[in-house]
Amino acid sequence: PDIVMSGGDVESEYPEDLPVPGASVVYAPSLNANMYRPISVKYSSAYPPISSWTTGNTRIIAYMDGYKPAIKTLKAYQESVNKYGSSTTLPKQAATGRFYTKKIDGRWWLVDPEGCLHLERSATSLRKGTSSRNKAAWNSRFGTDEKWLSTTQRELSEIGFHGTGAFCTGTYSLIQIHNASNPGSPLTLAPSFAFLSQFKSEKSYNYPGGSDDNAAGLVFYNGWAEWCDSYLAGSAFADYLRDPNVLGFCSDNEINFSSNSSRILDRFLAINSSNDPAYVAAKGFMDSKGVQSVTDALNNEFAGIVAEKYYKAVKEAVMKVDDKLLYLGTRLHGTPKYMEGVMRAAGKYCDVISINYYSRWSPELTTAIADWASWADKPFLVSEFYTKGVEDSDLNNQSGAGYSVPTQNERAYAYQHFTLGLLEAKNCIGWHWFKYQDDDGTDNSSKPANKGLYDNSYQLFPYLSFFARELNFNAYDLIQYFDK
């Protein structure tokens, strides 16, 4: 569909093909009793061709009873936020020159370097595509890094995205150059690292039991905490320390603290070397309990011990080099984000708990998200989520954790639906869409997928952009609506 997003002070109109909603019902799962008229959206966890779709009730702003968007133009949005996309109308907080977290009236917030309340809305993987058409389009549209990043910053900010997340490989330093040259229009950074594999290679260790599934067991190996100290004090972090445009950092990605089919305690006990430190830790834990058989409760407790040893070393190392640098955790995914022991450990040492949130059509407001608030008492950031359109994409879409949906229209509705749920959560301080640009070519072992805000010609997807913009522009107003 043709979507034209008006600029300046011209209001954008809803597209004519907006789905017809059902009758008004109470939105669920929710902590509130807000009414809405649901639209039906098809989705699937399978790769195409999709033989069976699930249909989910979906909430979009257009059909929320009792809510009308406060901000309808780019001009109005730009007048309501600062250069970070933070609110200039909500109560000002102490300005420290850095990002920090604060709980106000039961809701967690980020506070930006200027003291403005900030909801994080960014995109991961801001980097140049490697396919031949990526390269041709980049050269045609930009030609220089400076033009690429200044154009990208402007276009993203004009739909309410103001920064970057993990996996901006080769781009972080370019972003910092852009930020230095354009102090009034920065892109925030939230770089990701791979502490465990780096520790392993620098120490010439093998993975416990020879399996990277057991990478977390490296925290029991000699020198883990000391290595964290030296790594954070070294060249890998030098550029990020004391940079006001750095939101924070993630030290690893999706550590396997357990999965549905594989408990960490079972795995460590199965290591066939009785001298392996991970085995010794697991055996010592079982001996201390006086038991022979692993239970889910014991596994949860042990996973928490492993996670605490991991997070404690990283956080203490951070405090030695830059005590104002926010530690965003390890992008928890799958089973680990539902494990009380892991979440309690993360809450003890992380400033923000990053979560890659997949396999749920709606945020779990009354269950998992409430648990995170109770267990961790720290805010969470959704560090990955997306859907991929499989019927109007030129990619094979044979990879990726995000749901398949039919077209770009459903991607747009899914964005609003999921983020509206996140805005209801008083412990959520924002989200990072995965990702900046579609896969292409040989990405994901030649299984590229439609994940991007941008297509492979560096053009924003119009329908997704329209609905993301409406939500992002009104995010602060929506928080007031949900909190009233």
Regions found by a protein language model. Name each.
Residues 36-39, 43-183, 198-245, 297-300, ...:
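Active-site-adjacent substrate/metal-binding segments within catalytic domains
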Residues 115, 249, 318, 353, ...:
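Conserved, mostly hydrophobic/aromatic
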Residues 113, 211-219, 239-341:
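Polysaccharide-binding and catalytic clefts of secreted carbohydrate-active enzymes
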